């Protein structure tokens, strides 16, 4: 078995799905379907009965949700420094532990509003200039966001 320690994880072991090879620099490890492995680990973390450690919380955020500390903070209604502190000290508040699990599970299981909210936060972080374009259709106003350079005037 291979002890998988990516992202500071200490309790993950791979029974298979990896190859150890010798390189000029020592042993190297390659993983089959790394995205699937990451998803599987994150789902296991959302289902575990004990509280998340700081490393587990960080793994769900960074490898699973692919968001920064400030982005997760925005989703949770707090500042990014709080997220950083929890990850460093392993003192994740119970409410944040549960919310991170729910956000990840909803995003990966295709909960459209959650997935869109996470994607919006990630997009905002990339500082894309956008315009809000509002169209009236059948008496209802419908907003949409468009990249500034794609909007026709």
Regions found by a protein language model. Give the residues of each.
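Short alpha-helical "recognition helix" segments of helix-turn-helix
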Residues: 68-76, 83
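Short basic helix-loop element that most often maps to the first helix and adjoining turn
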Residues: 56-71
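N-terminal flexible/basic segments that precede or flank functional cores
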Residues: 1-51, 109-134, 138-141
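Short, leucine-enriched amphipathic alpha-helices that occur as contiguous helical runs
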Residues: 53-57, 97
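Extended, acidic-biased charged interface segments
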Residues: 100-110
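C-terminal, charged low-complexity interaction regions
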Residues: 140-153
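Short, basic-rich loop-to-helix N-cap that marks the start of a DNA-contacting helix
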Residues: 89-102
């Amino acid at each position: 078995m291979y002890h998988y320690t990516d992202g500071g994880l200490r309790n993950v072991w791979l029974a298979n799905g990896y190859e150890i090879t010798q390189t000029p620099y020592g042993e190297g490890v390659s993983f089959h379907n790394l995205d699937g492995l990451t998803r599987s680990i994150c789902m296991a973390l959302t289902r575990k009965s004990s509280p998340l450690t700081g490393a587990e919380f960080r793994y769900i955020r960074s490898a699973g949700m692919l968001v920064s500390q400030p982005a997760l903070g925005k989703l949770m209604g707090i500042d990014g420094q709080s997220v950083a502190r929890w990850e460093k000290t392993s003192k994740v508040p119970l409410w944040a532990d549960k919310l991170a699990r729910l956000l990840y599970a909803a995003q990966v299981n295709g909960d459209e509003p959650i997935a869109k909210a996470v994607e919006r936060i990630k997009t905002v972080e990339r500082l894309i200039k956008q315009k809000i374009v509002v169209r009236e259709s059948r008496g209802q106003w419908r907003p949409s966001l468009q990249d500034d350079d794609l909007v026709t005037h």
